[in-house]
């Protein structure tokens, strides 16, 4: 079963989209571009700093401008691990995730949920 069928829908759809983007540690260029395009697509202030951090800023809701700012943070990369019998290129392929009973898992590789679910 596809993870896109899970609830809450927006979370799992974002996670599925993210897992389509190769993002092994030390090779985050593709996922940085993906997240940057995501923020820009929502017309949010979006930039990438010298370290490769993607910062997306959303203005306060009307009437909440004087409230404290909330910051959500998570890392974009994932540790590229696969089963010995699995052919997979973490630099060019997206993670093939699916639902197995009560678990979300991946076909022969790590799922990328640390910290991909935080990014989603």
Locate each region found by the language model.
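Conserved short-loop catalytic and cofactor-binding motifs
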Residues: 19, 23, 47, 110
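Generic hydrophobic, helix-prone segments enriched in Leu/Val/Ile
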Residues: 15-18, 26, 56, 78, ...
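Structural signal for hydrophobic packing residues in well-ordered secondary-structure cores
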Residues: 16-19, 39, 43, 80
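Active-site metal-coordination/substrate-binding segment of hydrolases
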Residues: 64-120
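A non-catalytic alpha/beta surface segment that caps or lines the substrate-entry region
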Residues: 24-68
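N-terminal capping segment at the start of a domain
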Residues: 2-26
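Predominant activation on well-ordered alpha-helical scaffold segments within soluble catalytic domains
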Residues: 12, 16, 33-36, 119-120
């Amino acid at each position: 079963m596809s993870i896109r069928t899970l609830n809450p829908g927006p979370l799992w759809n974002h996670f599925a989209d993210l897992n389509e983007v190769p993002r092994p540690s030390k090779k985050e260029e593709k996922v940085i571009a993906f997240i940057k395009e995501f923020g820009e697509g929502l017309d949010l202030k979006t930039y990438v700093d010298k370290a490769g951090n993607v910062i997306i800023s959303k203005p306060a809701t009307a009437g909440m401008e004087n409230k404290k700012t909330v910051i959500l943070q998570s890392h974009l990369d994932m540790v590229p691990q696969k089963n010995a019998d699995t052919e997979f290129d973490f630099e060019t392929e997206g993670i093939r995730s699916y639902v197995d009973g009560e678990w979300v898992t991946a076909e022969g590789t790590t799922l990328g949920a640390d910290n991909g679910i935080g990014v989603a």
